[in-house]
Amino acid sequence: MDLPVDEWKSYLLQKWASLPTSVQVTISTAETLRDIFLHSSSLLQPEDELFLKRLSKGYLVGKDSDAPLFYREEGNKKFQEKDYTGAAVLYSKGVSHSRPNTEDMSLCHANRSAALFHLGQYETCLKDINRAQTHGYPERLQPKIMLRKAECLVALGRLQEASQTISDLERNFTATPALADVLPQTLQRNLHRLKMKMQEKDSLTESFPAALAKTLEDAALREENEQLSNASSSIGLCVDPLKGRCLVATKDILPGELLVQEDAFVSVLNPGELPPPHHGLDSKWDTRVTNGDLYCHRCLKHTLATVPCDGCSYAKYCSQECLQQAWELYHRTECPLGGLLLTLGVFCHIALRLTLLVGFEDVRKIITKLCDKISNKDICLPESNNQVKTLNYGLGESEKNGNIVETPIPGCDINGKYENNYNAVFNLLPHTENHSPEHKFLCALCVSALCRQLEAASLQAIPTERIVNSSQLKAAVTPELCPDVTIWGVAMLRHMLQLQCNAQAMTTIQHTGPKGSIVTDSRQVRLATGIFPVISLLNHSCSPNTSVSFISTVATIRASQRIRKGQEILHCYGPHKSRMGVAERQQKLRSQYFFDCACPACQTEAHRMAAGPRWEAFCCNSCGAPMQGDDVLRCGSRSCAESAVSRDHLVSRLQDLQQQVRVAQKLLRDGELERAVQRLSGCQRDAESFLWAEHAVVGEIADGLARACAALGDWQKSATHLQRSLYVVEVRHGPSSVEMGHELFKLAQIFFNGFAVPEALSTIQKAEEVLSLHCGPWDDEIQELQKMKSCLLDLPPTPVGPAL
């Protein structure tokens, strides 16, 4: 996903392996990115480009005139099953393949409006109705869509507009008698019912307003940092001789305090975990749902009513405004390259979009200016010697009175301020000397192939009369003879190498569960990849003192615990002490980020010499004490006479148990609740015989039982099971962790639906306290908790005890 697809990656690595040793040495010992790029790109042959082109065609990103009917029919099947979300997504796929001002476009929009109406998304439904009519919705079908429009307006409390719509509908009947003949009796009855409903209603509460702007305003940084853009005044930028740039607390910081709120300088939506579709006749069009179908490709807002690009079927947006902005900033160039960019991977895509956002001319200027002042090696490897020194871009000479003019910290401007701009992005470390030669070769050839496609597209856009002679044509199409292409290629190669250590995974919480389930499960999914210059300054800890959350393309860093003045602000790069053991964390950090972690969590665990983390521990079958040892495990209780058992035997039992849990979870997803409970109860009994009480699988089983019992309406049993899961989560992740917040949210849902008012209010308060440390007030779960609390507080007092 980040790197190219496996076929292209394997192809390039084989090409590297087949190169003469002298060529490999030349690339391996090249001192600058420019040399790496030029040496590598000279090896890209026409047959390589043809192979890449064939791979790119595996992604069906163009518009297919036969696809709208297919997706409309598939959407209709989902609609009949009352899966309105699934139907809306399939109708959106039909929209993305439709041409403007066609019946296909209008019918897909109209059908999607019906799905949105059943989902209660009335404002969005109205927009789709207007789109359907704009694109030429057939006259014979107008009554149905106009009635739906009136129903939306009534639901939104816009009664005057609803009345006008009904009047227009009735007037059309009078003016066009043929319409009355095709108007079904059910539609006439619905029209009568709607008119009666309007008479009964004086007004309706307005739909939930766009409170997002207000919550963002409420959560804004109270006091801007003069040295760091988008950062609180509670933190400062420093340089450590060993760590390089870092952020430290300039005053005592309380848990939950907002430290950084930064919009991504550039971001690209991850296409999803699914492979490209096969080319069989039965799978020409893909009905699978990915992030690209659910989120705006520019602002990352979740939407079921996507607005597609007019030129391709891949890029989709939440509004016409986002579509227009994306087109003007970068998509006009990316649009014809969609399949190629998906083949080359997200990192290559970001590298291109970054240069497009900045502008090729500005990229050329900054690199040329650097070339004029310092050596190529310093440009390409700014981390090579002195991490503190950097060029002062605002001065016209590199030396003054024999002294090097420098700003104190790389990435800062002439006034010493570090901002969210291209200067800061350019100064993020590419770690060129740490990447393997074959990886640099792979990245360079990806960028080179992309540059050649950009050249070809640019040449097609140049009128032939503008090309005076053959030398101009040669300069336009040959990268080696075109200095601009070399500059662009070097810039994109630098950014591609930077991304391994500086890319930020932009995540969201997705709720899953059986259809119609009141209590849902949640999981964190990677939605996009972005560059955040300020957040990139944070160093790693396996037990960080901050938490990150996202809304749209904005990342928010909050203190997850009390931070003393002078203490470093630390972020987790992924390997967290509650998710993996110290050996695995060290290996991942070393391979991706090129450092050996020496955080307190790693040092503490390294000295313990434990067999493994508690969430992977086994217990004694006789006394329940934890088992100890490596290959052979023995009971940790001295008074227990239980014989030793091999770890392999217990691991095998665990694997069998996990398979049974997966079967039960599928039963739960399919709605076979009683069978799921029976299967999970058996799994629970088996787990208790050999797994430690804090084992992750014990919590997983309890969570599944809680969801099954909730779906059956047995709220008391559901709460009991979830509290057991809650214990496992608390021991593993901590009482103030975001994972604990999600579990408390689920428990609050169960108490709320079981009418256990005191328990619900108490749990809601705990959940809000924990989640507020990690998320802003706009968080979906926090808003839902507030609605539940408001509802419970409005209930009349009752002497009856809790329902649970």
From Swiss-Prot:
Matching Gene3D superfamilies: 6.10.140.2220, SET domain, Tetratricopeptide repeat domain
Keyword ATP-binding in record: no
Annotated GO MF terms: histone deacetylase binding; methyltransferase activity; zinc ion binding
Official protein name in the record: Protein-lysine N-methyltransferase SMYD4
Organism: Homo sapiens
GO annotations of cellular component type: cytoplasm; nucleus
Known outcome of mutating residue 601 to P: Found in a renal cell carcinoma sample; somatic mutation
Binding site for Zn(2+) 1: 296, 299, 318, 322
Reaction catalyzed: L-lysyl-[protein] + S-adenosyl-L-methionine = N(6)-methyl-L-lysyl-[protein] + S-adenosyl-L-homocysteine + H(+)
Record's signal peptide: none
Role summary: Protein-lysine N-methyltransferase. Monomethylates PRMT5, modulating its transcriptional activity. May also act as a histone methyltransferase. Plays a critical role in cardiac development. Acts as a key epigenetic regulator of gene expression during cardiac development via its dual activities as a methyltransferase and negative regulator of HDAC1.
Location, primary (coarse class): nucleus
EC number: 2.1.1.-
Transmembrane residue ranges: none
PANTHER family named among the record's database cross-references: SET AND MYND DOMAIN-CONTAINING PROTEIN 4
Compartments reported by the entry: Nucleus; Cytoplasm
Family: Belongs to the class V-like SAM-binding methyltransferase superfamily.
CDD domains, alphabetized: SET_SMYD4
Residue positions binding S-adenosyl-L-methionine: 112-114, 427, 539-540, 573, 595
Keyword Transferase: yes
